[in-house]
Regions:
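Pseudouridine synthases involved in rRNA/tRNA modification
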Residues: 1-33, 78, 193, 202-209, ...
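RNA pseudouridine synthases
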Residues: 1-183, 187-192, 266, 286, ...
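Thr-Gly-centered strand-to-loop micro-motif
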Residues: 42-43, 99-100, 147, 198-202, ...
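Short alpha-helix capping/helix-loop boundary micro-motifs
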Residues: 43-48, 220-223, 258
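Short flexible coil/turn linkers enriched for glycine and charged/polar residues
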Residues: 84, 138-139, 165, 206, ...
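Short, well-ordered beta-strand segments enriched in hydrophobic/aromatic residues
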Residues: 88, 224-227
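Methionine-biased hydrophobic packing positions in alpha-helices, especially
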Residues: 96, 196-198, 240
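Long C-terminal interaction/binding lobes of large macromolecular proteins
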Residues: 212
Length: 305
């Protein structure tokens, strides 16, 4: 068993949301299970699952020992951009799930990392997510950093939490954006009627900020660059749909059917910048646009304007 102390400093929020935000790799559902088991206490008393925190609250969380991992190492193609004793940066292909989940028990990036790195992956994220510091969606391609030890994992997670890890994406959106650049500052939370989707909402939401700029305009479409100030689930997809420009191919937040031969959002994690946990140096990694993205641009024809 491991115990952690968590102190609330921000405004009121649900206790399960605080736990999921404060404990790397802990999901909201896992936090709710801990609450139901009485594993979260305040002043020695179990905390109820609907408790709303206030600044200054201090909680003690008892985390169970991880069960032996049943994950299988699989020798899958892995595009390694950089690797050392502390971390590995990979260029994830479109269509690959990051970690095992119901319906995707193998063939994931985690399975590939287990084969490539062996046992040298951090355990902070839990048995289902060894080494995983952050995620990108199945149909999003591009850069992702994984940690090989807990020291690196905690340091990288801290940079994500304080928004000092820079993540740059490129996307193709529907419609022609009027301005050359802009910022979407709109809170994101679970969709009120569809738990598999996210939405711009005020209820149980967290601040989300996306900075975008135009790379090229096409007839009815725009190639853009996005910088994440925060990293909420589906953030770019939700924000661009919110301002009336859903991502090309996004069947969840935009289209009802595939468009331009693309089923799944046209979104690529192009660059990643962070402080190396061991050396303290600022490191930057980039990767080229993948073939599917370049094919989409070719189908759009010549840029306009």
């Amino acid at each position: 068993m491991e115990q952690r102390t968590i102190q609330t400093q921000e405004s009121a929020e649900r206790i399960d949301a605080l736990l999921a935000r404060s404990v790397p790799g802990l999901t909201r559902s896992a936090a709710q299970r801990l609450l139901a088991q009485g594993a979260v206490t305040k002043d020695g008393a179990p905390v109820k699952k609907n408790y709303k925190t206030v600044p200054g609250d201090t909680f003690v969380v008892t985390l169970p020992d991880a069960a032996p991992s049943e994950l299988v190492a699989q020798d899958l193609p892995l595009d390694v951009v950089y690797e050392d004793d502390d971390l590995i940066v990979v260029n994830k292909p479109r269509g690959m799930v990051v970690h095992p989940a119901p319906g995707h028990e193998d063939g994931t990036l985690v399975n590939a990392l287990l084969a490539h790195c062996g046992e040298s992956l951090s355990g902070v994220g839990g048995e289902r997510r060894p080494g995983i510091v952050h995620r990108i969606d199945k149909d999003t391609s591009g850069l992702l950093v994984a940690a090989k030890n807990d020291f690196a994992h905690l340091a990288l997670s801290a940079q994500l939490a304080d928004h000092t890890m820079a993540r740059t994406y490129e996307a193709v959106v529907c419609g022609n954006l009027r301005d050359d650049a802009g910022t979407v500052d709109a809170p994101i939370g679970r969709h009120p009627t569809d738990r598999k989707r996210m939405a711009v909402t005020q209820k149980n939401a967290r601040r989300a900020v996306t900075h975008w700029s135009v790379i090229a305009r096409y007839n009815g479409y725009t190639h853009i660059r996005c910088e994440l100030e925060t990293g909420r689930t589906h953030q770019i997809r939700v924000h661009m749909a919110h301002i009336g420009h859903p991502l090309l191919g996004d069947l969840v937040y935009g289209h009802k059917r595939p468009e331009k031969g693309l089923s799944g959002q046209c979104l690529h994690a192009r660059a990643l910048r962070f402080i190396h946990p061991r050396t303290g140096e600022l490191v930057t990694f980039t990767c080229p646009l993948p073939d599917y993205f370049q094919d989409v641009l070719a189908r759009l024809g010549a840029p306009i304007g």
